[in-house]
Amino acid sequence: MDKKLNNLILVLNCGSSSIKFAILNPDNKEKYLSGSVECLFLLETYITWQCLGTKHKKKIGANVNHKDALNFIIEQVFSQQKDIFKNLIGVGHRVVHGGTKIKKSTLIDSNIIKCIQDASSFAPLHNPANLIGIKMIIEKYPSLSRKNIAVFDTSFYCNMPETSFLYAIPYNFYKKYGIRRYGAHGISHNYVAHRASLMLNKQFKSLNIITCHLGNGSSISAICNGICVDTSMGLTPLEGLVMGTRSGDLDPSIIFFMNNHLNLSIDKIETILNKKSGLLGLSGISSDFRYFEKKYYCKKHAKRSVDIFCHRLSKYIAAYTSVLENRLDAVIFTGGIGENVPLIRELVFSRLSLLGFKINSNLNLSTIGGKSGLITEDNSTPVFVITTDEELAIAQETNSIINRK
């Protein structure tokens, strides 16, 4: 047995329409198994995975749900890796929303499962999927039942000030029902913020940065002296930036108009705002940013959609400079779009030249495909592209908690 196959963590991320998994060593950061199931509930659900350098891809079927996909992963992938699995010391589960009670990563027990269930109203597309993964792993691997750790996206925001997390509605709605800003993507924001502190050679506790996680779901966070003081996602992951299928910010009266004048039910409106808006709604064609990158200069609907995306993002960046105590060390771009679409970085920072941003075109164009680095001129406020690794962050947090027990 390879000695490196010790101290392994299984990381499971059950999303709304996908499942990602990985087995890695949190100390040497080496991944031994990784993969994903994409396009759940659609006509063609497929799985791709890589184990010890060998790549695989299979079609699972049509209209596959989370349980079906997890059973396939367990029976067709995990069962073939007995040497790896017998060296697992724990399982880390990404959970989007911890609700009002959970402030940090924690060992999963019946009480934590109930808290995640109770918080599902705040993350209706994500928490139920997270719970399916948790329950199946505990059921299928009873020897690890006391070594399942929940790592929450909302934990990163637990120290935000009231000025950021309260909405201007009757205060009792917060005290009685927990209606407030919670944020999301906290695992990613926290990871790239710590990477940025190393790249800037600054103590994390003195770091003032703005982090932009841009993907199918997008969010932005302001970090002042190492503490997140504001973020764009709110009670749910619907608020904030323009996203793939989510609207982001809008006038709440739009909901009343849709309901009262268009006779749309609340459930129908919720579906529209979560699954049929954003880039998909603006273009009427796609939510995939690769499409918009190709068509930006030749299709009006693509240019319109991208320009609105960039307009919203640049406004947030400018606004967040106001909560950083008069010092901005850097802006960080991460996530699938943030890491791989130079066009977006160019368009956003061309709108922010007043704040001292000067993009280096060559660095911007070459920093893609997993590369991290500075993309600005020497006399500019720094902008970094940093590749996120939520799986590694979850594995390291899981390992830390297990070793504290």
Swiss-Prot record:
Cofactor(s) this protein requires: Mg(2+); Mn(2+)
Signal peptide range in chain numbering: none
Disulfide bonds: none
Reaction catalysed by this enzyme: acetate + ATP = acetyl phosphate + ADP
A matching Pfam family: Acetate_kinase
GO cellular component: cytosol
Gene3D superfamilies: 3.30.420.40
Enzyme Commission number(s): 2.7.2.1
A single GO BP: acetyl-CoA biosynthetic process
Function statement: Catalyzes the formation of acetyl phosphate from acetate and ATP. Can also catalyze the reverse reaction.
Subunit organization: Homodimer.
Protein's recorded name: Acetate kinase
Source organism: Buchnera aphidicola subsp. Acyrthosiphon pisum (strain APS)
Gene name for this UniProt entry: ackA
